[in-house]
A protein has these predicted regions:
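Conserved donor-binding/catalytic core segment of Leloir-type glycosyltransferases
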Residues: 166-185, 191-196, 205-209
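Short hydrophobic beta-strand element within catalytic cores of glycosyltransferases
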Residues: 285-288, 292
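Membrane-proximal helix-turn-helix segments that form the acceptor-binding/catalytic region
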Residues: 103, 112-131
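Short alpha-helical donor nucleotide-sugar binding micro-motif in glycosyltransferases
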Residues: 247-248, 255-260
Length: 375
């Protein structure tokens, strides 16, 4: 079987830049190779999706150096902002694009930037032979918003690594939110919800990178989103009960999961939510928004039970109410923990995820053979 070139962000192995996308890319590459579909990672450094001229040229040279007809899978963070580079390459390579998150869905973007991302991404995906999304919800959304043939948009959901059951703290009080501190992940909503429950007994860990924010050209500097979240916590008098860890390595993150009683993910947009599966793999119930694919990721168990609580996206009042229910109802907590442990047994492996990706890559190789046969 010939090798697929997998172009990924250069940050894929950087412990200071953990992300669900990087973890997905690395695990899929590893397990695809084990499944007999060789994948060669090609990491490219760059400020993707907004590369410098030199970074854009480096991507162009990497693509130009591949023989005609080479099957190439490109992470959407690298691909979707540079249609001027990807579209010409797609004319001679067998190009697939893996979309972790539509670029325009990242929170905090100005309208004109979001519109530019949408146009660029659409041009790239329409040029590609195949598109891979990380959930059924995301695949349907991508096909609709970019007017793609749904038959070319494939779903490859992430897998989950096995993990020990989390002992927790006291079964109720320790909350864990694992996400980069950005508007899309909704930590401002969580801060407000916690403030409305300040009389309850709890602590919260917000584990994830604290991205910097560039000031507008010629404009005044403003607090980062993380600083604004901290300010809100301070107004409620609860800043000392919330710990921001910054980016964590695997062992440190395992330690935070082990102490967690409830995982909270109040995202405004989400194409999958791998940290939800990672919590459920440890038997930790989840309080999540209903954004995007999160209801699918949280899932259900026997009797239609949900292994956690779902609230409307962007609704701090609903989030506060759900937290109040969690702390105020011991029977509810027992039931949710039991459902989370049942869901744990149903989570799929990365081997299964890689098998799905292998089927897409086989189609990509078949596209190559068909193209060669028409010459």
């Amino acid at each position: 079987v010939s090798t697929t070139v997998f172009i990924v962000p250069g940050s894929i192995g950087d412990p200071a830049a953990p992300s669900g996308g990087n973890r997905y890319d690395r695990r899929i590459a590893e397990e695809s190779a084990r499944a007999g579909m060789p994948v060669r990672e090609l990491p490219l450094d760059g400020a993707w999706p907004d590369p410098s001229g030199a970074e854009r040229a480096r991507l162009s040279r990497a693509l130009d150096g591949l023989p005609d007809g080479t099957p190439v899978l490109v992470d959407g963070l690298v691909a979707c902002g540079v249609p001027d580079v990807l579209a010409p390459a797609a004319a001679r390579l067998r190009l697939a694009v893996l979309v972790h998150l539509p670029l325009a869905d990242e929170g905090g973007l100005r309208a004109e930037r979001a519109e530019a991302y949408e146009r660029a991404e659409g041009a790239v995906l329409r040029a590609a032979v195949r598109v891979v999304a990380t959930s059924g919800h995301a695949a349907r959304d991508i096909a609709r918003r970019h007017r793609l043939d749904p038959a070319r948009v494939h779903t490859v959901e992430p897998g989950t690594d096995r993990a020990p059951l989390a002992p927790g703290t006291d079964g109720a009080s320790r909350l864990l939110c694992v996400a980069a501190v950005t508007p899309r992940k909704g930590q401002d909503l969580l801060a407000e919800a916690l403030g409305r429950n300040r009389d309850r007994r709890w602590t919260c860990v917000m584990a994830g990178p604290l991205p910097s924010e560039a000031a507008s050209p010629g404009g005044p500097s403003r607090p980062t989103f993380a600083e604004r979240v901290e300010e809100r916590l301070g107004r409620h008098g609860i800043r000392d009960r919330v710990r921001f860890t910054g980016a964590l390595g695997p062992s440190a993150l395992d330690g935070e999961f082990a102490c967690a009683d409830l995982m909270v993910l109040p995202s405004r947009a989400e194409t999958y939510g791998m940290v939800v599966s990672e919590a459920l793999a440890r038997g930790v119930p989840v309080l999540a928004s209903g954004a995007g694919a999160l209801p699918e990721t949280v899932g259900r168990v026997s009797g239609g039970r949900v292994p956690g609580l779902l609230v409307p996206s962007g609704d701090a009042s609903a989030l506060a109410g759900a937290l109040g229910r969690w702390w105020g109802d011991g029977a509810l907590r027992v039931g949710l923990r039991a459902a989370a442990r049942e869901r744990r047994a149903l989570l799929r492996s990365w081997r299964s995820a890689a098998a799905d990706m292998a089927r897409v890559l086989e189609l990509l190789h078949g596209d190559r053979a068909a193209a060669e046969g028409t010459r």
